Amino acid sequence: MLDNVLRIATRQSPLALWQAHYVKDKLMASHPGLVVELVPMVTRGDVILDTPLAKVGGKGLFVKELEVALLENRADIAVHSMKDVPVEFPQGLGLVTICEREDPRDAFVSNNYDNLDALPAGSIVGTSSLRRQCQLAERRPDLIIRSLRGNVGTRLSKLDNGEYDAIILAVAGLKRLGLESRIRAALPPEISLPAVGQGAVGIECRLDDTRTRELLAALNHHETALRVTAERAMNTRLEGGCQVPIGSYAELIDGEIWLRALVGAPDGSQIIRGERRGAPQDAEQMGISLAEELLNNGAREILAEVYNGDAPA
């Protein structure tokens, strides 16, 4: 590989390509003379669209092929939406940079209704996320929640075709694709606690690739990294994938991290919530201790039931 070339492995969805170009532009601005090439790929998550994610292996489906490209030295970095990044990495790879976070909230999108509370009973709401589903069902048990897969454009088309009365998407994705006008309401964390890392872009590379790690250092956003570290530590302790309804959101307020989290039964019948406040340097430990609290307060049983197997120890 030429010293002045860096290769980015990326999925081919419009949002994934936006993220890859975002990282490419940042790298070239920080390192004049660097040539950045995109290596587009198709992942299993892009191909299996007729089955809910939870049933086909979860969000790791979107990153595995990219990681193989890194391990086989066909690419130098992989760019991910942080909410799609599993808690564990293949040996030799790791998350080395987290870019500045976009708006982390969920978006209520509808052609006929202004907000969630305006939906009549029996309305059909589309979401592919058990996390969104459980919070929706708790707040509005009178709604019908149906699975919704595909990229952002596909999901909006299904709404426009009348298959749904409303759908829930990420604010960040809509903004990045220039579709902010489709957002009827951004749902505050009190109504829909975001996914771990939602709105942040993460960069994975080979851990022994010193040159690439040095190039990426300029893109790391310290505050976002602290917040996402707390969220991911909690998720790791819960052994959370996207197959279970887990929400986690950290804010940095007056120099202190405020971490909120929940674990819920998919039907919204039971949601265990908790929060922690503490010093930024304790971000990881805060996440772990909050996870322990949730497990002890009933999350262990919910997770065991959802996984149909062993609960986290």
Curated annotation (Swiss-Prot):
Cofactor notes: Binds 1 dipyrromethane group covalently.
GO MF annotation, one: hydroxymethylbilane synthase activity
CDD domains linked: PBP2_EcHMBS_like
Enzyme nomenclature, EC number: 2.5.1.61
Enzyme type, top EC level: transferase
Listed cofactors: dipyrromethane
Catalytic activity annotation: 4 porphobilinogen + H2O = hydroxymethylbilane + 4 NH4(+)
Biological-process GO terms, alphabetical: protoporphyrinogen IX biosynthetic process
Pathway field: Porphyrin-containing compound metabolism; protoporphyrin-IX biosynthesis; coproporphyrinogen-III from 5-aminolevulinate: step 2/4
Keywords: Porphyrin biosynthesis, Transferase
Modified residues (S-(dipyrrolylmethanemethyl)cysteine): C242
GO cellular component: a single term: cytoplasm
Transferase listed as a keyword: yes
UniProt xrefs under Pfam families: Porphobil_deam, Porphobil_deamC
Xref: InterPro entries: HemC, Porphobilin_deaminase_cofac_BS, Porphobilin_deaminase_N, Porphobilinogen_deaminase_C, Porphobilinogen_deaminase_C_sf
Family under the similarity heading: Belongs to the HMBS family.
Protein task: Tetrapolymerization of the monopyrrole PBG into the hydroxymethylbilane pre-uroporphyrinogen in several discrete steps.
Additional note from the record: The porphobilinogen subunits are added to the dipyrromethane group.
Quaternary assembly: Monomer.
Name by which UniProt lists this protein: Porphobilinogen deaminase
Species lineage: Bacteria, Pseudomonadati, Pseudomonadota, Gammaproteobacteria, Enterobacterales
